[in-house]
Amino acid sequence: MHKVIRQMSQLRLQAPQGAALLRSADSSSISPAISPVSPPALQSKSLHTAASAGMLCAKWNKYNYGPRKWLEYNKTVHPPQETDEEPRNAYVCHMRSNIKYSPDKMWYIAAFVRGMSVDEALKQLNFVLKKGATDVKETILEAQQIAVERHNVEYKSNLWIAESFVGKGRVFKGVRRHARGRFGKVEYKHCHYFVRLEEGEPPQHYYQEPQTPEQQYESWMEQMRSRKIINSL
């Protein structure tokens, strides 16, 4: 039996090349309509729900365009001004949507640049060691370019940040493998960054101006004198 198997293997090895060519020609002559269909190959060997996976994120986030109302303020048409009125300062609203960053972390950066001039904000953001600082800086630069090209701003350095805030974007929920067959929930958060640049010099106090000691004393005295004794004459 072993001799027969050995002889068959030798005959297979010594077969002429024409037989192989004939076999390949026969296989190529089969029409594609009746050719055997191979099972579709999987695009990825493992399934991961990370937002950076690409395939799943693109499908889930296909029609998520982000907020649209903020950019509509650029289309506002103001009424003409009188000759004795103070000229209205030019402004531009800009945004960046679906940033892969937590809105809670981005809030610190957005609040940091409020009330600064554009040049000062760009300088300060170079030293902010946070991932979201890059997106904020790029958004401010884009808004600065739009203000010069489309909104008749003469000097690009004559702008200050009038508004800077963050909105919550889409949250992708996934799972993470833990030990002993357990799993943990994971949230991949996104955010939207909004900025409004205004022409002119920034104000000295963006927020409410702090009171002087004399003003604090006057407000305290007024508060004390306005007290009322209950059930008195």
Swiss-Prot record:
One of its GO terms (biological process) is translation. It is found in: Mitochondrion. Transmembrane segments: none annotated. Keywords: Mitochondrion, Ribonucleoprotein, Ribosomal protein, Transit peptide. It comes from the Eukaryota. SUPFAM superfamilies: Ribosomal protein L22. Its main location: mitochondrion. CDD domains: Ribosomal_L22. GO terms for molecular function: structural constituent of ribosome. It holds the Pfam family Ribosomal_L22. One of its GO terms (cellular component) is mitochondrion. Component of the mitochondrial ribosome large subunit (39S) which comprises a 16S rRNA and about 50 distinct proteins. Belongs to the universal ribosomal protein uL22 family. This is Large ribosomal subunit protein uL22m. It comes from Drosophila melanogaster. The gene is mRpL22.
